[in-house]
Amino acid sequence: MGTLGKAREAPRKPCHGSRAGPKARLEAKSTNSPLPAQPSLAQITQFRMMVSLGHLAKGASLDDLIDSCIQSFDADGNLCRNNQLLQVMLTMHRIIISSAELLQKVMNLYKDALEKNSPGVCLKICYFVRYWITEFWIMFKMDASLTSTMEEFQDLVKANGEETHCHLIDTTQINSRDWSRKLTQRIKSNTSKKRKVSLLFDHLEPEELSEHLTYLEFKSFRRISFSDYQNYLVNSCVKENPTMERSIALCNGISQWVQLMVLSRPTPQLRAEVFIKFIHVAQKLHQLQNFNTLMAVIGGLCHSSISRLKETSSHVPHEINKVLGEMTELLSSCRNYDNYRRAYGECTHFKIPILGVHLKDLISLYEAMPDYLEDGKVNVQKLLALYNHINELVQLQEMAPPLDANKDLVHLLTLSLDLYYTEDEIYELSYAREPRNHRAPPLTPSKPPVVVDWASGVSPKPDPKTISKHVQRMVDSVFKNYDLDQDGYISQEEFEKIAASFPFSFCVMDKDREGLISRDEITAYFMRASSIYSKLGLGFPHNFQETTYLKPTFCDNCAGFLWGVIKQGYRCKDCGMNCHKQCKDLVVFECKKRIKSPAISTENISSVVPMSTLCPLGTKDLLHAPEEGSFIFQNGEIVDHSEESKDRTIMLLGVSSQKISVRLKRTVAHKSTQTESFPWVGGETTPGHFVLSSPRKSAQGALYVHSPASPCPSPALVRKRAFVKWENKESLIKPKPELHLRLRTYQELEQEINTLKADNDALKIQLKYAQKKIESLQLGKSNHVLAQMDHGDSA
C-alpha cells in the first residue's frame, strides 16, 4: 500500500490483496528505516493510470465508462486521449458484464444516435467497435454469443445503408491462422552456439538440463492468454482452460519426475548422485530466473518420499544440504512468499514467475474488492488493479529466453515428464528402497517446506495426434543419434541407457533380431509407456468373470485373501488376474491377452524371457508348475497368473536389474507344504536372480546362472514371473548333513509362527464353511428322500 494507497480516498483500498502491496509493506518493516518504502513498478504504473482517468478513477456508472471509451476517438478514427481506459474496459469488462451484453449496450447507443440523427456519434461507435475487433479479435473467435450479437449489429448497420460503417465493423479480417500461429510459433532462442546434446540422463550436464526444462516451461507459460487469466478469475478453477491445465500439469510432472529419477537408482550412493545433480539443476534454474520450474524441482526433492531416505541423505555432502536449505528458504510460503517476492522483484529481463503464487494473488484481489461501490458505480480501481496484475504476467511472454534448445532433447523430456503415478505408488517405491525401521514409530507424511500442490491432480486433456507426433519425433531423434550404420536397429544396451530418462514402466519387447531393437518396436514402446496414451484407454481392459475358487487365492490388487465358499472373487478370462469385487474397478494393470501353450519347455522359457524377469530364489517362491499352466504374451513376456504364486513387484531396470516387492506376498508357501522351509534358504549364498536349468538337459548345464545387469532404472508396477516344471525335485535336494544352515533369529521364528497362525485361522474358517455346506446338502438330501417316501405312500 505505502503512501500511494493512503493518498487516495476510496471506500476500499485498490491495492488490497495485490502482489505489490504485501511486498512493499514487508520491505518497510524489515528495513527499520524512517524513510518510506520505495513503491514498486506496478504501483507507479497503477498510480499514473488513475491520474490519467481523472474523476472516473473514483468510480463511474457503466454507461459513463462506455461513453468515455467512445469519445476517445476523433472524427477520423484516431485516439484523441489516452487509450488506457479502452484497454482496461475491453479486457476486464467480463468481471461485471459479459461481452455480448456490452456489445448490446453499444448497439443500443447506435440505435439512439440514428434516431437523433447524429452521424458523428454513429461513426465514433463504429470506430470503437473496430478497435475492439482489431485489438481483441480473439474474443470474437472464442465467444459464440458475442459473435451472434455482432451479426445482429452488422445487420442493423446494413439495414440503414451505411456502407462506411459496415466496412468498419467487418469481422472477416479475423484470420484464424494468425491466432493458431501465435500459440504454436517457435520460441526465438539464442542461436549463437550450436552443440550436440547427449540424450542420456547420466551424461546431461545440469546446465543443459535446466535450459531445456526452462524452454519447455516458457513454451507452456507463453500460451496462457489474457482471457485464460480472466476465465480463472471468474471460474476460480482451471476447468475448461486447457492452456493453464497444461502449464500446471507440466509443473506437477517435473516434481514427480525428480522424485522417480532419484528413487529409480538401486543404491543409496547412486540415489545421492542423482539428488546432487538436481541440486545443481536448481542452481542453474535460479540463475535463469525460472522460479516456476525451480519450485517444482525443489518441491520434488523436499517431498517426504525423498526426505525419508536416511541412507541416501547420509551420502549427500554438507554443502549440498546447505544449498537445499537456501533454496527452500527462498521458496518458503512464510509471510506470503515474502522471500520469493523480493527476489522476483529484483529480477530484470527474462524471468518465469511461480504461476500458483500469482494466481492466488489474483483470486485474493478479486474476492477482496467489490465489483460495485455503495452508490452503484463500477469499482474502476478493482478493474485497474486486476488489469495491471494480469498485464504484468502477459508482458513476460514477449521476452525471449537466453538459451539454445536441442529439439531431440526437447522431445525426450516431453515424453519423460508425462507421468501418471499416484502418491501411493511413489511411497511404495520409497519404502521398497529403504524400508521403515520397525523399532521406530510409523511416520505420517508431513507437509514439506516447499509445496507444489496448489493445483495437484491437474492433467492435460489427451490428444492422440499430439502423442503420435512427439513419439515419432523422439524415435527419429534416437535413430539419428544412435543408429550410426543406418540399418534400422539400435542395440539393447543403447536403448536401456536412453530409457533411463523415462521413469515409467519398462516393457519387454520381442526383438526382430536378437540383441537389437527396430524402429517399430521402439515406437510401440514409447506409445505404450506414454501416460496420456494410458489415460486414453487404448490399452486392453480386463474381462472379469465371477469365479468360484477351489483353493486359497489372493487378490492381485490388494494382496488380500478371497473369502467365501462360492464366488469368492473375479478372474480375468484373458490374463488370469484375480481380485475382490471391490477391487475390480481399481486395478491399474493393463490386461495382456495370453496365448495358451499346452507345454512349454525350459529351453523356450530361457530363450524368450529376459533373465531379469525370472523369479528370485526365496522361501515362498518354490518352483512348481501351476495347474492352469502359464502363457506367453505376444511381446515375449511370460507371466504366471495362477493362484499358486501371487506377488506384487516393482521392476527397476537400469544400473542393476532389481525386483523389489512393494506389496504383501501370499502367505501360503506351497500347495502341498506350508511349514517346511526350502532346502536352499538360509545358505550363505546371496539370493538373487537365477535361471534354473531342467534336469532333462545335459548334466553339464549350469544349475545357476546370474542374470546380467541392466543399466536402465525404470520404476513401475509390473508383475513378471517365470517358472520351471521339475520332473524329479528329489534329485536336487541334497542330504541334510551337506547343508550348512544358519540359526534363525527370534524375529524370523516369531514371524513364521504368526504366518502359520494366520494360515491356520484361514483354513479353520474355510473348514467351517465347508461343514455348513455339507450339512445343508445332507439336510436337502434327507428332505428329498422324505418327500419321495410321502409321494409313494400317497400313491
From Swiss-Prot:
Gene Ontology biological process terms in this record: activation of GTPase activity; B cell proliferation; cell differentiation; inflammatory response to antigenic stimulus; mast cell degranulation; natural killer cell activation; positive regulation of natural killer cell activation; positive regulation of natural killer cell differentiation
Signal sequence residues: none
Domain (EF-hand): residue spans on this chain: 470-505, 506-532
Binding site for Ca(2+): D483, D485, D487, Y489, E494
N-terminal Ras-GEF domain boundaries: 53-176
One cellular component term from this protein's GO annotations in UniProt: cytosol
Function: Functions as a calcium- and diacylglycerol (DAG)-regulated nucleotide exchange factor specifically activating Ras through the exchange of bound GDP for GTP. Activates the Erk/MAP kinase cascade. Regulates T-cell/B-cell development, homeostasis and differentiation by coupling T-lymphocyte/B-lymphocyte antigen receptors to Ras. Regulates NK cell cytotoxicity and ITAM-dependent cytokine production by activation of Ras-mediated ERK and JNK pathways. Functions in mast cell degranulation and cytokine secretion, regulating FcERI-evoked allergic responses.
Quaternary context: Homodimer. Forms a signaling complex with DGKZ and HRAS. Interacts with F-actin. Interacts with SKAP1.
Family of this protein: Belongs to the RASGRP family.
Protein name, UniProt field: RAS guanyl-releasing protein 1
Species the sequence originates in: Mus musculus (Mouse)
